[in-house]
Amino acid sequence: MRKIRPLAFVLATGLGFCGTVSVASADGDAGAYLAARLAGSQADYVLAAQYYARALAADPQNTQLMENAAISEVGRGAVDKAIPLARSFDTKGGRNQIADLLILTELAQKEDFAAAIAALDAGRSAGQLVDGLYRAWALLGLGQMSEATGAFDAVTKISGLKSFGLYHKALALASVGDFEGADAIFAGADGGPLRATRRGVMAHVQILSQLERKADAIALIDESFGPAGDPTMMALRLELEAGATLPFTVVKGARAGLAEVFYTVASALGSENTDLNTLAYARMAEYLAPEEADAILLVANILERQGQHALASAEFDKIARDDPAYLQAELGRAAALVQSGRVDAATEALQRLAKDYPDRIEVWNTLGDTYRREEQFAEAAVAYDKAIGKISGDEAGYWSVWFARGICNERLKQWPQAEADFRKALALRPDQPAVLNYLGYSYLERKERLDEALGMIERAVAARPDDGAFVDSLGWGLYRLGRYAEAVTQMERAVELMPVDPVVNDHLGDVYWAVGRIREAEFQWRRALSFGPEEETEAARIRRKLEVGLDRVLAEEGAAPLAVTKNDR
């Protein structure tokens, strides 16, 4: 699970939430307060909201509790409950960006655009970018289009924000029927074409359709997503091919425009390590546009990254079956179910998807991954067979499917098929370190192609020098080749990188034994046992080495004895 910093601290560095709440501030119910803090530190918004509500009931005038309660309600998606808390916080003299964000969102939801502008004029702020775009859309909501255009232009003049201002100006023009003006912006009349975000492409496609440029719209979809990409875009493409004129639906009015502002900011923050800030803006977007699939999916993905799998699953569930985004949502829901331990439910959902979408490679691939995760390798291999059977044209992007099937075949002891899959994956992606390492290590274990295996692993380690598994493979390869002194250096490095891995510690023990460091070998074998080998056969072999030594174990297994030395090679 991803590590989450304490809730209040995260927000203090982003949206301006207060950094700490003293225990003394929650004297009415210190236990509830402490439980809320713990839940918040784990991003458990539901539990945090429950405990903050209890603490606030015992101390209803406490503004810091109001603030933290509002944070938790936003996190769990109860924006309608967070808004009154923000209002109370504000009335009692509290002031910060989360309260301002919630109050501005409430005004947008009510479409009280005059009050929204007055709030900005009075100093309320949700951040420089939001404030500028919010003002522009509110002016549009008041019917003041020329003033709105000027406000969008003002945003474009702020350093680093030009593309945001242009994008929203284009949406605003399209929302009032000026498709020529909107197309000019997307095409680059104001200094180069806008960066092709998914939402931007969707908007431009709809604009081109309105301008009766269907061929250009189809070409834009193909250029941006390929022949079998995003299901929503493919649905638009089918409509265009059928001769339909697409309505402009990305933004239908000022409130939807304000929702798009919050979605834009959340998406921009998505690549940064500020998930709670991102979630707050995404929740505002969802609140203002509850039917917007993109906002729902963004919220769900953020929650998934935070480890809040139940909340994420509930979000994915909001996407209707007839929505083109349903496939993406169900794949996301299945992933959330897996992460929450409900693998059977995830498998069932994926099996249904496979029946409904039998030609979608990603469905079969995800089903295979789910089976493989549970070590159901035969079932996984069948699913990967289906996925590979659907691949046509450029195969390079699907190297991982052959790699995954190769792992299944290797585990099923079907080595010829496994080797062929690994070789195919390497043919598609020659320098892929995971494939190089896995195939190289497999050759080592089979005592085949040892020199080639070592070369593969060396390439993998060169690509990922801090990957303990790869360094372990390199050390083990040197050991297999009898280059024991060199193996010691690599295996010691592997243990530094993976100190509690039983296999790596066991390997280091063998290498120490090979160079005569008997006590250190025994110490490493005991460490390996303490970390719990996955298989009892592995543990039994380690215990036998401790009883009689590695040389005797190799003799009992009919294996070749250790070389005297090959370190001069």
How would you describe each model-predicted region?
Residues 68-69, 102-103, 134, 168, ...:
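Canonical tetratricopeptide repeat
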Residues 65, 99, 131, 165, ...:
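TPR alpha-solenoid repeat register
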Residues 58, 89-93, 123-126, 157-158, ...:
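Structural marker of alpha-solenoid helical repeat scaffolds
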Residues 24-31, 121, 127, 159, ...:
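TPR-adjacent "capping" and linker segments in tetratricopeptide-repeat scaffold/adaptor proteins
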Residues 40, 74, 108, 140, ...:
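Position-specific recognition of the canonical hydrophobic site in helix A of tetratricopeptide repeat
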Residues 37, 71, 105, 137, ...:
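Residue-level recognition of tetratricopeptide repeat
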